[in-house]
Swiss-Prot record:
One of its GO terms (biological process) is mRNA stabilization. Residues 73-83 have a biased composition (Basic and acidic residues). This is ATPase synthesis protein 25, mitochondrial. GO terms for cellular component: mitochondrial inner membrane.
Length: 703
């Protein structure tokens, strides 16, 4: 199934569809939940359970609510306030939970309603899948009106169902194919199906191999390499209903295949875990009805709501990702559409140069000014970047509506008024980026996205550099460096995904290592936060009261997002930049994702990249900081001898020796005492060698 799906990456439309599926299932902007049967998309052709009863109930109540809306609004408001005030005094152990309705088990077996002009086979097929095959939570998607047609074919109807187990999945898929062959003389194709006794034979072979090799951990692996928990049964082309569809008129067809009157039916059979991970209903529902994404009020309110100058309540600044990007890659070059002057254009006597004294040393720039901006605006942003942060924030005024309260604002809007429309939009986008990077409380990331949206709506040419600068700013952290429990808000990630989607529609390749690195970092914590119930996961030398902890479920959710991003990178054949490897290794290890840490560690030499001293130093320090004895023992036993086998070999110096000794103190806390007493242990020989190396380093430094 994966091999067929990956062929679509060669088409630009399929790349856009793949990005939409990533945005739907990556859990970056919303928590991953299993699709419930009561969800419906207004105006779309997504048919699910409970749509009939829920829609009638909501529609019948609409008239009575509208007739009494004006008269009952004050009373309802007062009643709501009184109720909330009274409920605030009720302790949690006295709160009544009987009002929470529980879904009836029989609702899982309800059949979805048939679409308009259904094929004759569809009703019997749904009945067989639900009753005989035993699949639950059936959902039916009518994709016949989708233009361009999906990769599975035109005039497509998709059925999605949940199996109870992997064994039930394979048995149901096999019986469905046999039923279609015997009753309808069709030739279905089932991708991912293991035939009769194939699953049992493969499991026996894997257990026998694990017993011979002594690797019992592979039996408990969730990804056994045998089944994916997903079977796609392509029923084939069947006869359509007696009525013609509304879109049956002749039109130019673009794509593969032909425009026939037959309908193709595909049955997606998944286990519960795979269905909640893939979110096929959310993907195809967003394609059928793009307006359904507008129904989510949480991220949209910050973008489409009131962005007046008086609103100063949402945003803080950003931290290190976008602000230090030019420092991490100082030699990076770009292609510009207009020449940039070698020296800043001289300002009038009343300029910011009077504020920045020549005698003061140059401060590190916290603003990456966009090279596409006009020369006057670029020079103003450069002058602003030389100011201290507090002074620069004062120069930005009171908010987006302020234009003349400070000297910088007067000069900026004066320069903007003399430019053409495209240059004005670029200058305003650069100004919004600078304001967000300076952590001004009145300038929010929603203002930055609004400037980008205005530029995109005007039809201006948006370069890849300008769009990526916007994405870096949106995916950057807001609080101070090393802030506890600091994460990028979901609304900001949603805005960045919209910018990336716009880039994809303009033909810009968004499947690159930098985008995935930013998404990895934005979905994680800014600094190391240990788990709340992980005993021994933290070094005993650190005061546990001074460290903020999080629940294990939070770290597991971050690990799930990182694993999905890694799978998408492997599917698109994308890899990270080598310069980002140390930060990725640290992020994986500190969030408890040790499998991805070692996978990336083992992948480095396979890419013909040597593991340097910095990587080994990082690994030993991370294990020493973790404080886990067993992991420290495995690290020392495996990788201290490996340092001499690297190409080129990693030589010991004083810094690396001290890191190894700190890791040995975690593996054996009494190793120094054992060395003095002459007791032989696993690492006493290595400890003595490290002591001799430290003495030689001190002697060499003294000379």
């Amino acid at each position: 199934m994966s091999g067929i799906a990956l062929q679509g990456f060669r088409c630009h439309a399929c790349r856009n569809a793949a990005f939409r599926s990533f945005a739907a299932i990556s859990s970056l902007s919303s928590s991953t939940r299993r699709p419930q049967s009561s969800i419906s998309y207004p105006g779309s052709k997504l048919y699910q359970r409970n749509v009939r009863t829920t829609g009638r109930r909501q529609f019948s109540a609409l008239g009575s609510v509208q007739s009494q809306a004006d008269s009952d609004l004050p009373t309802k408001t007062e009643t709501k306030e009184d109720t909330s005030a009274e409920s605030s005094h009720i302790p949690w152990y006295l709160q009544d939970e009987s009002h929470k309705p529980s879904s009836h088990p029989l609702k899982q077996q309800e059949l979805p309603p048939l679409p308009e002009n259904p094929p004759p086979i569809l009703e019997n097929l749904l009945q067989y899948i639900s009753v005989d095959a035993g699949l639950d939570d059936l959902a039916l998607l009518d994709l016949r009106g989708l233009d361009p047609p999906p990769a599975l074919g035109a005039n497509l109807i998709m059925i999605i169902g949940t199996a109870r187990s992997v064994k039930h999945l394979n048995v149901s898929g096999d019986r469905l194919c046999r039923w279609l062959r015997s009753n309808y003389q069709l030739r279905p194709v089932a991708d991912g199906l293991l035939g009769r006794n194939d699953l049992k034979i493969k499991l026996r072979r894997r257990a026998r191999k694990a017993k011979v090799t002594g690797d019992a951990s592979s039996l408990n692996s969730r990804d056994d390499g045998i089944t994916t928990g997903w079977i796609c049964v392509n029923v084939g082309d069947v006869e359509n209903g007696p009525l013609k569809t509304k879109n049956s008129r002749n039109r130019n067809f673009i794509g593969f295949g032909g425009t026939e009157d037959k309908v193709r039916i595909v049955v997606q059979m998944l286990v519960e875990e795979t269905r909640s991970e893939l979110q096929l209903e959310a993907l195809w529902g967003s394609l059928l009805n793009p307006e359904a994404g507008e129904m989510n009020p949480a991220p949209r309110d910050d973008v489409w709501g009131d962005l007046s100058s008086e609103t100063t309540s949402s945003g803080k600044g950003v931290d290190s990702i976008a602000s230090t990007f030019s420092q991490r890659f100082p030699g990076r070059r770009h292609i510009h559409t207009q020449a940039r002057p070698n020296t800043p254009e001289p300002l009038s006597h009343e300029t910011l140069g009077d504020i920045v004294q020549e005698s003061r040393p140059a401060l590190p720039s916290k603003i990456v000014s966009t090279s596409m901006a006009s020369p006057n605006v670029s020079s103003l942003l450069e002058q602003l970047s030389r100011l201290p942060e507090e002074e620069a924030r004062r120069e930005l005024g009171l908010g987006p509506g302020d234009r003349d309260s400070t000297l910088f604002l007067r000069l900026f809007y004066e320069a903007v008024s003399k430019s053409d429309t495209e240059t004005v939009l670029i200058d305003k986008l650069s100004f919004a980026r600078a304001a967000v990077l300076l952590k001004h409380p009145a300038y929010r990331k929603a203002d930055l996205y609004r400037a980008f949206k205005s530029m995109a709506a005007s039809g201006c040419s948006i370069s890849e550099e300008l769009a990526m600068d916007t994405v870096r700013t949106l995916l950057s952290f807001q609080g101070p460096e090393n802030a506890a429990n600091e994460r990028v808000p979901e609304q900001d990630i949603d805005l960045a995904l919209r910018v990336l989607e716009h880039m994809s529609l303009r033909g810009i390749n968004i499947f690159n290592g930098e985008v995935f690195f930013l998404l990895h970092k934005a979905s994680a914590f800014q600094s190391h936060v240990p788990a709340n119930d992980a005993p021994g996961a933290m070094n005993t030398s650190v005061n546990p009261d001074s460290v903020s902890k999080v629940q294990v479920e939070e770290l597991d959710r971050i690990t799930t997002v990182h694993n999905r991003l890694s799978k998408l990178m492997a599917s698109a054949n994308v890899d990270f930049d080598y310069k980002d490897y140390p930060e990725l290794l640290k992020m994986y290890f500190e969030h408890g994702n040790y499998s991805n840490f070692w996978r990336l560690w083992h992948r480095i030499p396979l890419m013909q990249i040597p593991r340097t001293k910095e990587l080994y130093l990082l690994m030993f320090r991370l294990h020493a900081k973790l404080g886990h004895q067993r992991q420290a023992v495995d690290c020392l036993s495996s990788w201290v001898p490996m340092m001499a086998r690297e190409q080129p070999p990693v030589a010991l110096d004083e810094e690396l020796t001290r890191a190894i000794m700190a890791c040995m103190l975690v593996a054996d806390p009494a190793i120094d005492q054992k060395t003095d007493d002459g007791t032989v242990s696993q690492f006493t020989r290595l400890w003595k060698q490290c002591l001799r190396d430290l003495e030689s380093f001190k002697a060499a430094n003294s000379q």
